Amino acid sequence: DRLRSWKNSVVSKLTAGLGQLTRQRNVDYLQGRASLVDARTVVVTMTDGSIREVPFDAGILATGSRPARLAALSSEHDRILDSTSALDVNQVPGRLLVIGGGYIGLEIGSVYAALGAAVTVVEMTSTLLPGADADLVRVLSRRFGSVAAAIYLDTKVTRITADDEAVTVRLDGPDVASGDQRFDQVLVAVGRVPNSEISGLDQTAVDVDPRGFVGVDAQRRT
């Protein structure tokens, strides 16, 4: 509870600071849902229900990203966490499975391990932190291996189901015992996807690829 309260206080300070900066810079801040009418006009449905039309000469698409879903996950459950909900749990799970050996999964997993959870990490590639410098990965693997209950590389999650008692997971990998494994909670950390489903974006010449990424040039212009 103390750690979660501290996290919430940090978030509150950051958002309050951004609000102060917008006022100091005379930024007109609108809170609502935006829809593009064309390449020079956006309509905002405000939180109070009113409508604002905002013309512009140039716009910045900064809608952020969200945690990617796992293909083997058929439904949502409170016992299945992402990188956002993992920072807001009420108690530390006894057994935590981290799906994804990237920096997000390892960072959050190491926190839970320090808090007393038995953390198991599953990564579908042959190494933790895919794409990172191999020398750094070796050091991190030794360090994380000393606190993790288990690390399974070259391993995929083929099935995952959750109920009020636990999360049942089936893994497919060279070092995994056959059969299902049960965990108190599961953290899905398999990357992030862009929030590019912007209403009216198809009314512009902006190019969006099949994965949802906006096409830009070397100067990040659409």
Task: Locate predicted features.
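Core beta-strand elements of the Rossmann-like FAD/NAD(P) dinucleotide-binding domain
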Residues: 49-58, 175-185
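Phosphate-coordination loops involved in phosphoryl transfer and adenosine-cofactor binding
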Residues: 31, 39, 56, 77, ...
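Rossmann-like dinucleotide-binding cores of NAD(P)H-dependent redox enzymes
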Residues: 5, 9-19, 87-88, 93-97, ...
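Feature captures the FAD/FMN-dependent oxidoreductase FAD-binding
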Residues: 2-58, 151, 158-168
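FAD-site-proximal beta/loop scaffold in flavoenzymes
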Residues: 76-92, 181, 185-222
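Short glycine-/small-residue-rich Rossmann-like dinucleotide-binding loops
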Residues: 46, 60, 64-65, 173, ...
